[in-house]
Amino acid sequence: MDKLKNQVITGKSIRLLQQNQYTFQVDLKLTKTGMKDWIERFFDVKVEGINSSRMTSKNGKKKNKLNITYVSYKKMIVRLKKNYFIPLFMSQT
């Protein structure tokens, strides 16, 4: 379970739980297909789609005064097919 760091809990992610979408913070090297295969095997569910984004933490400056953006983590929103849910989060309302 080292690919999945933790669940992201924000106002938006709680609203997405009602639409059967789960938000995770994952390893930076993890791809969408890798995440899909891992989620389907580990939780025994069917994944309909995945959205991913690389989240930035801070900006830095180099000697030549160019702005550099550091990537701190990757966030994935996993959308499951109907009648499937991840029992860990108990999102069924």
UniProtKB/Swiss-Prot annotation:
**Where found, per UniProt?**
Plastid, Chloroplast
Q: Which InterPro entries match?
A: Nucleotide-bd_a/b_plait_sf, Ribosomal_uL23-like, Ribosomal_uL23/eL15/eS24_sf, Ribosomal_uL23_CS
A Gene Ontology cellular-component term:
ribosome
> Which one of the record's GO molecular function terms can you name?
structural constituent of ribosome
Membrane spanning residue stretches:
none
| Gene3D superfamilies listed in its UniProt record | 3.30.70.330
Primary location group: plastid
Keywords (alphabetical) are: Chloroplast, Plastid, Ribonucleoprotein, Ribosomal protein, RNA-binding, rRNA-binding
Could you mention a single GO BP entry for this protein? Answer: translation
Question: What is said about its interaction partners and assembly?
Answer: Part of the 50S ribosomal subunit.
Q: Which family does it belong to?
A: Belongs to the universal ribosomal protein uL23 family.
Tell me the function of this protein: Binds to 23S rRNA.
- Provide the protein name: Large ribosomal subunit protein uL23c
Species name:
Adiantum capillus-veneris (Maidenhair fern)
